[in-house]
């Protein structure tokens, strides 16, 4: 199918030139009317909050500024007070040191004034005792000799001590004398014990000499008869 042909009209723009100029002038004289945009309630709340926050921030900043100013003033006052305190302490120390130095000077002057008359008194005393110094020195020499003699005496005493020790040697103990107990039981009368026999058999050399020197004595008649009777019994 073929499309239908449109009817085209030829338009002369020369007819509309004046009207176009008038529209341009009208647009220049009065601009298009501005439409008012309605703000939503959320945006209004946000604006109010932002306003409050801004006010609070401004108040906080003002308070901070005031505090900083006060701190600065306090620090300045404290620094001035500290300076004054340091000055007072220095002044007190200086005054104390000056007073101590004055006291020392006064004491030294007093001591010097006391020493001068003492020296004057000591001078004649030394002149009087000057002659006895030599004697004193001689006495010192005697003391030195006395010390040397003491040392010698000590040495002699030390040497004599071991001799005393030798003298104090322990003495040998005496042998206990044993007394023979009498023999119990039957014993023949007249028989000597073994110890007595041994003593009789071993005559001492002195007794032998005496027997050799002394001549044999003659037996009496009674002793001879007794010997014979004893031999007959045996």
From Swiss-Prot:
Q: Where is the composition biased (Basic residues)?
A: 35-51, 149-174, 185-199
Residues with the modification Phosphothreonine, per the entry, are 179, 202
Consult the record and explain the modifications the protein receives after translation: Phosphorylated in an ATM-dependent manner in response to DNA damage. Phosphorylated by CDK1 and casein kinase.
Q: Low complexity composition bias: which ranges?
A: 91-100
Positions of the UniProt region annotated as Disordered:
1-234
GO MF annotations for this entry? chromatin binding; DNA-binding transcription factor binding; double-stranded DNA binding; transcription coactivator activity
The superkingdom of the source organism is Eukaryota
Q: Composition bias, kind Acidic residues: at what positions?
A: 111-124, 132-145, 223-234
Q: Where is the composition biased (Basic and acidic residues)?
A: 64-77
List the record's Gene Ontology CC terms alphabetically: chromatin; cytoplasm; nucleolus; nucleoplasm; nucleus
Tagged with keyword Iron-sulfur: no
| Keyword annotations of the record | Chromosome, DNA damage, DNA repair, Nucleus, Phosphoprotein
Where it sits in the cell: the answer is: Nucleus; Chromosome
BP-aspect Gene Ontology terms: cellular response to X-ray; chromatin organization; double-strand break repair via homologous recombination; glucose homeostasis; interstrand cross-link repair; intracellular glucose homeostasis; positive regulation by host of viral genome replication; positive regulation by host of viral transcription
Positions bearing Phosphoserine: 14, 19, 54, 58, 61, 73, 75, 79, 113, 130, 132, 144, 181, 204, 214, 225, 231
User: Which parts of the sequence carry Phosphotyrosine?
Assistant: 13, 26
Q: What is its main location?
A: nucleus
Q: How does it assemble?
A: Does not interact with RAD51.
- Function as written in the Swiss-Prot or TrEMBL entry: Chromatin-associated protein involved in DNA repair by promoting homologous recombination (HR). Binds double-stranded DNA (dsDNA) and secondary DNA structures, such as D-loop structures, but with less affinity than RAD51AP1.
Write down what this protein is called.
Answer: Nuclear ubiquitous casein and cyclin-dependent kinase substrate 1
């Amino acid at each position: 199918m073929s499309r239908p042909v449109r009817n085209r009209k030829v338009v002369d723009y020369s007819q509309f030139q004046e009207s176009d100029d008038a529209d341009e002038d009208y647009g220049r004289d009065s601009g298009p009317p501005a439409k008012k945009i309605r703000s939503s309630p959320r945006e209004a709340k946000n604006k109010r909050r932002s306003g409050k926050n801004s006010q609070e921030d401004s108040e906080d900043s003002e308070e901070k500024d005031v505090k900083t100013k006060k701190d600065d003033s306090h620090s300045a006052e404290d620094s001035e007070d500290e300076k004054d305190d340091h000055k007072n302490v220095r002044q007190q120390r200086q005054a104390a040191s000056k007073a101590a130095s004055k006291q020392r000077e006064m004491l030294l002057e007093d001591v010097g004034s006391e020493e001068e008359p003492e020296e004057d008194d000591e001078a004649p005393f030394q002149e009087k005792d000057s002659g006895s110094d030599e004697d004193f020195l001689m006495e010192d020499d005697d003391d030195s000799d006395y010390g040397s003699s003491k040392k010698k005496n000590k040495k002699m005493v030390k040497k004599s001590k071991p001799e005393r020790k030798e003298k104090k040697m322990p003495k040998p103990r005496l042998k206990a004398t044993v007394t023979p107990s009498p023999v119990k039981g039957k014993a023949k009368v007249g028989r000597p014990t073994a110890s007595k026999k041994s003593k009789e058999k071993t005559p001492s050399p002195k007794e032998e000499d005496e027997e050799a020197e002394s001549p044999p004595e003659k037996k009496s008649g009674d002793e001879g008869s007794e010997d014979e009777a004893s031999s007959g019994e045996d």
